[in-house]
Amino acid sequence: MTSTAPDNSRNRADALPKSWDPSAVEAEMYERWVSAGYFTADPASGKPAYSIVLPPPNVTGTLHMGHALDHTLMDTLARRKRMQGYEVLWLPGMDHAGIATQTVVEKQLAVDGKTKEDFGRELFVEKVWDWKRESGGAIQWQMRALGDGVDWSRDRFTMDEGLSRAVQTMFKRLYDAGLIYRAERLVNWSPELRTAISDIEVKHEDVEGELVSLRYGSLNDDEPHVVVATTRVETMLGDTAVAVHPDDPRYRDLIGTTLEHPITGRQIPIVADDYVDPEFGSGAVKITPAHDPNDFEIGLRHNLPMPTIMDERGRIANTGTEFDGMDRFEARVKVRERLAREGRVVAEKRPYIHSVGHSERTGEPIEPRLSMQWWVKVEALAKAAGDAVRNGQVVIHPASQEPRWFEWVDNMHDWTISRQLWWGHRIPIWYGPDGEVVCLGPGETPPEGWVQDPDVLDTWFSSGLWPFSTMGWPDATPELTKFYPTSVLVTGYDILFFWVARMMMFGMYVAEDPALTAGKDPGQVQVPFKDIFLHGLIRDQHGKKMSKSRGNGIDPLDWIRSYGADALRFTLARGAQPGGDLSVGEPHALASRSFVTKLFNATKFALLNGAAPGELPDRGSLTDADRWILDRLDEVLAEVDAAFDAYEFGKACEALYHFAWDELCDWYLELAKVQFAADGARAESTRTVLGTVLDAVLRLLHPVIPFVTESLWKALTGGESVVVAAWPTASGVTPDADAARRIADAQRLITEIRRFRSDQGLADKQKVSAKLIGVDSAELDALAPAIAALARLTEAGPDFAATASVEVRLSGATVTVELDTSGSVDLEAERKRLEKDLAAAQKELATTEGKLGNEAFLAKAPEQVVDKIRTRRDVAAAEVARIGARLAELGAR
């Protein structure tokens, strides 16, 4: 339509590009935000505080879709709170990732045929720092591409001097309190890395192994013997007992006796233990306390010897047998072969599918191994972490995750914190020449000649201090006074028990520290965060977990390049719900990009027609359409606020999507076109209403899709930046229920006319002569011009002859629609089209009914699949009926 807008609005429209090209504007726009200081937090501000610490990604890594989800949700929260008038600190940083980083650098050295030992510890650590300085910036660049509104002036790294000081302080406090100790216990051992690794670094995979049943004791059936089965036959070199259930009658007479070890010759006892399942296998279990976690516990209960039979590289050692020096997998074969030669192998099953823990870093099977390590005594720490949630000091969203939290913290085992690495926080323990041991805090110097413990701390130890160490603890700082406790932690439920638990334990341990309580309400407990929001895992569009082996992973940077950061962010936020997994694929990204494009085109149309926010005219002078869209805006604002406050990102995005697309663009913009063509006052008020609603929609959408909304909002309002614009608030006006009812009736009438037109074979844009009977009874007189325009109807002339009619039942009356399609439709062509459509519908009906009548299919198919087929069947049946009726109608002509 021809624009009646004033010239300045056309200038504002010209400020926008012809079409939205994210790659042309996003990078420059982001740097403008950073340069303007919008993301820099001011601890001296009088505004209420809102703070989030970014879960630190590994310095070795790049952002995957899980990171992109985390960052999108955190940025959404931070941007919204900033618009609501809060002083926002979103603090970024990276984790030094001990094992991962050391492995990367060692692999680089290996290319030149070098090892870390060739350089020595000090020089190797310096090489790691060099690598970090050269390669550590990739993640920051990716965060900028995503649009993360973080305070770059406070960027932290877990090996920074300040954070290292915090780590040493916490270690000494725990050590002095008797909560850190050294002991020989079973750990997950990586022979390739030659270090203990944490549970979270172990992934369990099904492998094709072997199950070997072997005979202890006499080879004569009438003399004492037992049969045990194992998937790791080499570990029998470290067996120190055979366990049976105390009530198993088969072994009652053997309990307390000994049998000769088939290879070492030592006598090993038969012990009774309730752990053994008498129904499984032979009911007898070989016990290798130094190389199996369950066997270790049995060994403790029965005071068994615990010889370690493998060295740090996974080679057999100290057994006094011909197998010493062999790799564990070679020994597995050789031990089995010897036992077979001696007639002790009773049965072999291969392949035998069983689950084996693998190192996430190297891919090798981990080896449970008895090792001297440093441990944290967690009982009191874990109780405090659990109580913080029980007492409501920390709230988990969704609440359905609370039982998992309590199950974990209430049953936590002591935590091994030492790692046999060179890169990381060195354990601050020194040993004297006569066996003395001292723990030193920051700034303390060891006596001359004392040697520091060679191990480093588990990465989770330093990242467990992240919420407060990043703000300057153990010093009292303005940041801690203003922004601690942090407002919310956003993370996936899959690491709830690892990183989150560590932060909670440490945070509660120092909750009464003067550095954290200074300037605070004495009654306020200094928890690390007030809320924990747990989202689910990202799956592909078919609901399968993303993994390298499946090849179904998505690089978020690829999506940013293809669809723009806004489309990526909207896809992730729209699918996010508390505790629930979300499935994403290209169709979702395309839909989000279409939404961004729709918003861009709608704003450009509004600008071309002079739309601008301003003081709204008196309600009495507004049309039903105006009052309806303004009232709906209030309703959607309330829905969006409630959803965001409850961390229901998906619900907020759905509300905004449907309001912006279905109601604002598809309905109000079309109604506005009719109003723009009216007299000057009506057109002007329409411009103000459209501008006001669009202004609010852009502000509401900004936290999720910041780039396009910034460009559009500045063009629409001429404001500085939507980043610092005020969050919309409710108008306080009582909604007009009558206007809403009339608009709903008009929408139903237009929709039914469009459907009826289609049934008559009319093209979408083809106008047709029509009569609407009963419009006055339905109170739609004022909307009649809009109904005619949107339904593509023209006024009936003197030659009007109705060829088809339909009755549309509305809320208070029935409107009859008569159409004159004579000369508008090629009846023969329409008949052929309908016959083709009928054949397709009949085929779909037959296919779906066939599946639903197949008992074998119904027995195997998932319920959701069957439901989808039922829906398809119902749709096909309705289509067959509708098309058949239309063909019958054509046959009567």
Curated annotation (Swiss-Prot):
The keyword Coiled coil applies. GO terms for biological process: valyl-tRNA aminoacylation. InterPro entries: aa-tRNA-synth_I_CS, aa-tRNA-synth_Ia, Anticodon_Ia_Val, M/V/L/I-tRNA-synth_anticd-bd, Rossmann-like_a/b/a_fold, tRNA-bd_arm, tRNAsynth_Ia_anticodon-bd, Val-tRNA_synth_C_sf. Keywords: Aminoacyl-tRNA synthetase, ATP-binding, Coiled coil, Cytoplasm, Ligase, Nucleotide-binding, Protein biosynthesis. It catalyses: tRNA(Val) + L-valine + ATP = L-valyl-tRNA(Val) + AMP + diphosphate. ATP binds at residue 548. Residues 821-855 form a coiled coil. It is found in: Cytoplasm. Monomer. Belongs to the class-I aminoacyl-tRNA synthetase family. ValS type 1 subfamily. This is Valine--tRNA ligase. It comes from Nocardia farcinica (strain IFM 10152).
